Amino acid sequence: MNIHEYQAKQIFAKYGVPTPKGLMAESVKQAVANAETLGGSIWVVKAQIHAGGRGLGGGVKLARSLEEVEQLSKEILGMTLVTHQTGPEGKLVQKLYIEEGADIKEELYLGVVLDRAREMPVIMASTEGGMAIEDVAHNTPEKIIKIAVDPAIGFQGFHGRELVFGLGITDPNEQKKLISFASKLYKLYMENDAEMIEINPLVKTGSGEFLALDGKMGFDDSALGRHPDIEDMRDISEEDADEREAGKYGLSYVSLDGEIGCMVNGAGLAMGTMDTINYMGGTPANFLDVGGKANAETVAKGFEIILKNPKVKAIFVNIFGGIVRCDRIANGILEATKLVDVHVPVIVRLDGTNAEEAAAILRDANIANVIAATDLADGAAKAVAAAAQAK
């Protein structure tokens, strides 16, 4: 689950992570009132959406008067903001964050993410703050510092020293401040079951203070039961409607850009299926894991969600029955053909528990556009061929 910048900064405040003062607004009038409340002569008007690249997309603007705050708020609030992370459809801006200006001397990058290969959190930092960290990683990877932190010992002084030396910070007072900053950020990450925390930019001010000028946070959905205060921050309007609908039926769904719909049981098999489709020359339109409790209703709902995507030219159902029974999947496919206009070829590979019964169910139904596959490679090849033929 992701949250907005203004919410991330509320959490920063609880942990003593320094940020500029700011207030959220849902109207132009409220934005101007917030600027008056904050005081000063310079404010930053920020679009609040769940995506990075807001500044380059025109969603972060500097205002030097209350009139300018009003003008910029009118421009940004209600706009469809397109960034490199939103896709071409963009996101509707429904909230603003009005923040006091900061005396920026230097921009850095600081984040904490989970390194799945090392199986531990990693602190990432760079002197290239304010830029897309993906671009820095691609073009100049040597400018990114990565410090693995073993959860068994937590953030220690030697981690902090590696951080400040790596960033070239030599002033003892500044070193102490940044080490304290990073220590608080790591504590926040661990105590809240975060998956990712990113501050870009982390700025050093003219007085040598460090401030989180931005804040992105993502949390482990499976751990939200331990953090009701964070779950209350969920903004459903920022989430994909199909993903939310799938979740109601116990389906894990992620929309992608390809043209072959995928329905698989198990995340590992789902990723392997998508890799095989790519290897065969196709592109997956989605990730859809029906899980171990799939029945006819959930399978039918999966078809309905997949077919909402007009790009889908074929569907590949790849089930290896262990907990989930293949005959239930077969009945779900039949149910889907009754409830939904399944107008594309459906390639079906069923193996494992009750696979023979499932094959008989589909064979007896004799549905013209349901095509049997013998294994993963055969199914992927047939799906790619069917999608190509439908173009």
Curated annotation (Swiss-Prot):
Q: What class of enzyme is it?
A: ligase
Q: What is one GO biological process annotated to this record?
A: succinyl-CoA metabolic process
Q: Which cofactor does it need?
A: Mg(2+)
What residue stretches are annotated with the ATP-grasp domain? 9-245
The answer to keyword Transport applying to this record is no
Originating gene: sucC
Keywords in alphabetical order: ATP-binding, Ligase, Magnesium, Metal-binding, Nucleotide-binding, Tricarboxylic acid cycle
Identify the species of origin.
Sulfurimonas denitrificans (strain ATCC 33889 / DSM 1251) (Thiomicrospira denitrificans (strain ATCC 33889 / DSM 1251))
Any single Gene Ontology cellular-component annotation: cytosol
Q: Report the function annotation for this chain.
A: Succinyl-CoA synthetase functions in the citric acid cycle (TCA), coupling the hydrolysis of succinyl-CoA to the synthesis of either ATP or GTP and thus represents the only step of substrate-level phosphorylation in the TCA. The beta subunit provides nucleotide specificity of the enzyme and binds the substrate succinate, while the binding sites for coenzyme A and phosphate are found in the alpha subunit.
Q: What is the lineage of its organism?
A: Bacteria, Pseudomonadati, Campylobacterota, Epsilonproteobacteria, Campylobacterales
What is known about its subunit structure? Answer: Heterotetramer of two alpha and two beta subunits.
Protein name listed in UniProt: Succinate--CoA ligase [ADP-forming] subunit beta
Q: Which positions in this protein are listed as binding substrate?
A: N265, G322, I323, V324
Q: Which residues bind Mg(2+)?
A: N200, D214
